[in-house]
Amino acid sequence: MEVVILGGSRPIGKLAADAIEELLRRKPDAVLGLATGSSPLPVYEELAARHATGLDFSRASGFALDEYVGLPDGHPEQYRNVIRREFTDRINIEPANVHSPDGAATDIPAACDAYEAAIAAAGGVDLQLLGVGTDGHIGFNEPGSSFASRTRIKSLIEQTRKDNARFFTSLADVPHHVITQGLGTIMDARHVILIATGAQKAQAVRDFVEGPVAAICPASVLQFHPHATVLVDEAAASALKLADFYRHTYDNKPSWQGI
């Protein structure tokens, strides 16, 4: 796991976009793992700007990390619609190549299996973007999730529903269930970039980067990933014991190495 401490959301977005641009130039049909929430927004902004100056997404594909269960088609908070609004409608990726779990399916387990099969048929995810919750969750893999888990239905804990209520008219409108890629699914991605900003994420960052690998902190499984990059601002890095080491390592790595 590489930890990179940067000065704010803009340099974080630029560095993550650098990795995605390099991937697309090397592999134009790359498979991107797309997250929602505030963490990836600077990346999407930067990629949209680069597309405007020529970065090509026409052969790429994308897979959303998760989706609410039970929201009607067209609901603005369906994650498939959020991803379109915030990113894919701003680039030239083919709409048919952007996939998300079917939260409106009548047979949810079958929809989960179909999503796993679609990821596998695409050749797997080349680069997965992630955020992290204050309790260490990634995707909607809440504390206690199995490290071997695959795409499945999950119940949202009340704190997560409260955190997401700002996107809905009221807490009562926030769904109780989601479909999420599992921790095992996420770990299959060839490169994972996790973004965390703000002091409210500092304890979670310390727990999953420097704490024990434990189900109480789902993101800690990334310690076992062969190519995980953690991009944090100074506030999110404020609880890290080894912050100076991470700064020294990044400042002195060869320029050709990338992230």
Curated annotation (Swiss-Prot):
Gene Ontology molecular function: any one: glucosamine-6-phosphate deaminase activity
Entry-linked InterPro entries: Glc/Gal-6P_isomerase, Glucosamine6P_isomerase, Glucosamine6P_isomerase_CS, NagB/RpiA_transferase-like
EC number: 3.5.99.6
Catalysed reactions, semicolon-separated: alpha-D-glucosamine 6-phosphate + H2O = beta-D-fructose 6-phosphate + NH4(+)
Any single biological process term in GO: N-acetylglucosamine catabolic process
Residues spanning the signal sequence: none
Highest taxon above the source species: Bacteria
Keywords: Carbohydrate metabolism, Hydrolase
Gene Ontology CC: cytoplasm
Residues forming the catalytic site: D66, D135, H137, E142
Pathway: Amino-sugar metabolism; N-acetylneuraminate degradation; D-fructose 6-phosphate from N-acetylneuraminate: step 5/5
One Pfam family in the UniProt entry: Glucosamine_iso
Similarity remark: Belongs to the glucosamine/galactosamine-6-phosphate isomerase family. NagB subfamily.
Role this protein plays: Catalyzes the reversible isomerization-deamination of glucosamine 6-phosphate (GlcN6P) to form fructose 6-phosphate (Fru6P) and ammonium ion.
Name assigned to this protein: Glucosamine-6-phosphate deaminase
Lineage: Bacteria, Bacillati, Actinomycetota, Actinomycetes, Micrococcales
